[in-house]
Curated annotation (Swiss-Prot):
The keyword Cytoplasm applies. Pfam families: RabGAP-TBC (PF00566). PROSITE patterns: TBC_RABGAP (PS50086). Its main location: cytoplasm. InterPro entries: Rab-GAP-TBC_dom (IPR000195), Rab-GAP_TBC_sf (IPR035969). It comes from the Eukaryota. This is TBC domain-containing protein C1952.17c. Residues 34-387 form the Rab-GAP TBC domain.
Length: 619
C-alpha cells in the first residue's frame, strides 16, 4: 500500500469507535508510522500501554495520570523545602546539615542535589545537533526583577506549594484514590503559573549547585532557606541565566529526577536521558498539545513504560547475572550473530573484539546515539511494535520477554552490512568503526532485519539460520578487491625503497645488484594483472587473478566452504609472498649465527627455513 493508503489505514484504526486492535496496529507500526496527524504519539501511547484500547476512556486516563504527575512534582521537587522548614520549627535539633544518618532530611536534600547535578550535565549533552534541549526558556509569564521576590519568597507560615495551590485553586494531593470516578480536569487549569513555579525552584537548586562548586566551605554549609532569605530578589545574572535553561531541558530534568526518586532501587543512570529524548521529542512536536506541561506529564509515563522493558539493563546487581542483565543480553546477541554469519563471528573472536566494546551502548540506549534522530524515531516504531507483539503472543527468543528480539536482529544487520570493512581491518580500526556514528541507509538496514527475522522464525535448526551462506558471491569482485589492496601495498613499498638500499647477504656471499633485487616487481605485478610474467614464476602456475576470476559462483550446500578453503590458500600464498617482499626491500636485517639458505632458494616467493632477527618498517 502507498503512503496515503497507510495514513488512511492508521486513521481508521486509531479513530475506531470499537476497541483498537493492537495486533493490527503493531503490524502497521512495525513498517513505520507516517509523520502526520499526530499518529506516532497516539500509536506509541497505545503500544506502550499508556492509553487503553477503548477511546472513550482516553480523556479520563490522561487526566488521572497528569494529576498523579503533578502531585509527584509537588511532593518530590518542591515539597522538600517544607520538610526542612517543618523540621526546624518542630524544635528537633538532632538534624543538621552535617547529619549523615539515613533518616536525615538534610542528607536526603544533598543526595537529591547530586542527582540533579548529574541529570543536568547529561541533559545538556542530549541531542546536541538539534539544540532541542539547549533552547531558551519561553515561560508564559516571566517575573520581573522587582516582583520576583514575591514569587520566590519562602513563607515561614505557609508552604510554597500551598501558595501555588491557592493561586491555582488546586487541592494538594496526598494520595491517589484509584476508585475516584470523577478526576480533576487538569486540562482546564491554568498550568502557566505552576510551570513557572517549577521552573524557579528547579533553576534555583541547579544554580545553587553551580555556585557551591566554586564557593567556600562556609557557603556550602549554608541552608537553602538561608540562601533564599538572604536574597529576596534574583539578581541580573540569575535572570539572564533563566533564559539559558530551556523549557524542554527543564521538563526532561524533572522527569528524570522524579523517576529516580520513585525508583530508589535503580535511581538515575547515565543513558536514561537518551531513552527519554526521542519519547519527549515526539510528544513535544505534536501540535495537539495545549502546552508543554501536559506533554511533560505524558512523557513521564511513556518513559516509565519504556523503562519497564529495559530496566534490567540498568540494574547493577544484574550486570553479571547469567539469566538477566546486560551481559546476558550481549551473550545472546553473540550467539545469534554466530548463527547468521559464522565467518564474521569467527573473525571478531579471533581479533578478541568482545561485544562489550561496541554493543553495550547500542542496547542500553536503544541505538539512540548511533543514528540521526529521524532514523532513531523510525527504528523505534519497529522496536516498540515488536515488543508489543511479543507481549501479546508470548513468542520471543531473547530471554527478555521480547523486549530485545527486533533490536538484536537489527544489531546483527549492522554487523553484516559492515562485514567487509570489519573483515579487512585490524582490532583498533574495527573498534573505531563500530563505535562511530553509522553512515548506513536506515531502510536498507530495516529490510535486512526483516529478512533475518523471517529466517530465524522459519528455520528448523541453527544451520538453516545462516544468512550469509544463502547469498551468491561474485568472485570477480573478490579478486578485484584483493588486487586493489595488494596494489596499494605494492605502491607504498616501491615508493619507500631507498635508492642506496642493498639486499641482504648470505654468509660469505657478495651483495646482489640493486637491479636484481628489484626483479620481483614484474612478477609481483603480473601475478595481479593476470599477465604471464617474464620471470619469477613457474610455467603453468595459477596466479591470484586466474584463481579468483571465475564466473559468478552461486554457492550451494558446500560451496562457501570450498570458496573459503580456496581463499585461505591464496591469502596464505600472498602472505608468504608479501612477507618475503618486505624482508627483501625494507629491512635492516641482522643475520643470526644460524641460517640455512642455499643459493637456489634465495629467490622471492620460494619458502626457506631460516632464523633471522629482523627490524622491519611497519606499513
Amino acid at each position: 500500500m502507498d503512503y496515503k493508503q497507510r495514513i488512511e489505514k492508521f486513521k481508521d484504526i486509531l479513530n475506531s469507535e470499537e476497541p483498537i486492535s493492537l495486533p493490527g496496529l503493531c503490524s502497521l507500526c512495525i513498517q513505520g508510522i507516517p509523520d502526520e496527524y499526530s499518529l506516532r504519539a497516539k500509536a506509541w501511547m497505545l503500544m506502550l500501554e499508556f492509553l487503553p484500547t477503548d477511546r472513550s476512556n482516553w480523556q479520563s486516563v490522561l487526566e488521572k495520570h497528569r494529576k498523579t504527575y503533578t502531585s509527584f512534582v509537588q511532593e518530590l521537587l518542591i515539597d522538600p523545602w517544607r520538610k526542612l522548614t517543618l523540621h526546624e520549627e518542630s524544635g528537633e535539633n538532632s538534624d543538621h546539615p552535617l547529619n549523615t544518618s539515613d533518616d536525615s532530611k538534610w542528607k536526603e536534600y544533598f543526595d537529591d542535589n547530586q542527582i540533579l547535578e548529574q541529570i543536568d550535565k547529561d541533559i545538556r549533552r542530549t541531542l546536541p545537533d538539534l539544540s532541542f534541549f539547549q533552547g531558551k526558556s519561553e515561560i508564559n509569564k516571566k517575573p520581573s526583577v522587582n516582583n520576583v521576590s514575591e514569587n520566590i519568597s519562602v513563607n515561614t507560615e505557609d508552604d510554597k506549594v500551598e501558595e501555588v495551590g491557592q493561586k491555582l485553586n488546586y487541592t494538594k494531593i496526598t494520595s491517589i484514590d484509584q476508585s475516584q470516578e470523577t478526576p480533576v480536569h487538569l486540562s482546564t487549569i491554568d498550568f502557566s503559573k505552576f510551570q513557572e513555579e517549577c521552573h524557579l525552584v528547579l533553576q534555583g537548586r541547579i544554580y545553587r549547585l553551580e555556585n557551591e562548586s566554586t564557593s567556600s566551605s562556609t557557603t556550602a554549609l549554608s541552608t537553602p532557606r538561608q540562601s533564599m532569605d538572604s536574597k529576596r530578589t534574583i539578581n541580573a545574572e540569575a535572570i539572564a541565566g533563566e533564559n539559558k535553561l530551556g523549557l524542554h531541558r527543564e521538563a526532561a530534568e524533572r522527569i528524570l529526577f522524579i523517576y529516580a526518586k520513585l525508583n530508589p532501587g535503580i535511581g538515575y543512570v547515565q543513558g536514561m536521558n537518551e531513552i527519554l529524548a526521542p519519547l519527549y521529542y515526539v510528544l513535544a512536536t505534536d501540535p495537539t498539545y495545549e502546552n508543554y506541561y501536559l506533554c511533560e506529564c505524558d512523557a513521564f509515563f511513556l518513559f516509565t513504560q519504556m523503562m519497564v522493558q529495559v530496566r534490567d539493563l540498568y540494574e547493577k546487581t544484574l550486570d553479571h547475572d547469567s539469566d538477566h542483565g546486560i551481559h546476558f543480553l550481549m551473550s545472546k546477541f553473540t550467539e545469534r550473530l554466530k548463527k547468521y554469519d559464522y565467518e564474521l563471528w569467527e573473525n571478531l573472536e579471533e581479533k578478541q573484539i568482545h561485544p562489550t566494546y561496541y554493543s553495550f551502548r547500542w542496547f542500553t540506549c536503544l541505538l539512540s546515539q548511533e543514528f540521526p534522530l529521524p532514523d532513531v524515531i523510525r527504528l523505534w516504531d519497529s522496536i516498540i511494535a515488536d515488543q508489543m507483539k511479543a507481549r501479546l503472543f508470548g513468542k520471543n527468543d531473547d530471554g527478555f520477554n521480547g523486549a530485545y528480539d527486533f533490536l538484536m536482529d537489527f544489531c546483527c544487520s549492522i554487523l553484516i552490512e559492515l562485514r567487509e570493512s570489519i573483515l579487512e581491518r585490524n582490532f583498533a580500526d574495527s573498534i573505531k568503526l563500530l563505535q562511530a556514528h553509522f553512515n548506513v541507509d536506515m531502510p536498507k538496514l530495516l529490510n535486512l532485519t526483516f529478512e533475518l527475522q523471517h529466517l530465524r522464525k522459519t528455520s528448523k535448526n541453527d544451520e538453516d539460520m545462516s544468512y550469509v551462506r544463502k547469498n551468491s558471491y561474485n568472485t570477480n569482485a573478490l579478486a578485484n578487491s584483493l588486487k586493489n589492496r595488494v596494489l596499494s601495498t605494492y605502491n607504498t613499498v616501491k615508493a619507500n625503497v631507498p635508492q642506496s638500499s642493498s639486499s641482504y647477504t648470505d654468509n660469505n656471499k657478495q651483495k646482489e645488484p640493486l637491479e636484481e633485487k628489484r626483479s620481483f616487481f614484474p612478477s609481483f605485478r603480473s601475478s595481479l594483472d593476470g599477465v604471464s610474467p617474464t620471470q619469477g614464476r613457474k610455467s603453468g602456475e595459477e596466479n591470484i587473478r586466474t584463481i579468483f576470476a571465475k564466473p559468478t559462483a552461486h554457492i550451494g550446500e558446500n560451496g562457501w566452504s570450498n570458496l573459503k578453503v580456496k581463499g585461505s590458500s591464496i591469502f596464505q600464498r600472498f602472505g608468504n609472498f608479501v612477507g618475503d617482499t618486505m624482508r627483501y626491500i625494507t629491512e635492516e636485517e641482522e643475520s643470526s649465527e644460524e641460517e640455512d639458505l642455499t643459493t637456489s632458494r634465495r629467490k622471492i616467493g620460494i619458502t626457506s627455513k631460516r632464523k633471522v632477527s629482523v627490524k622491519r618498517n611497519v606499513i
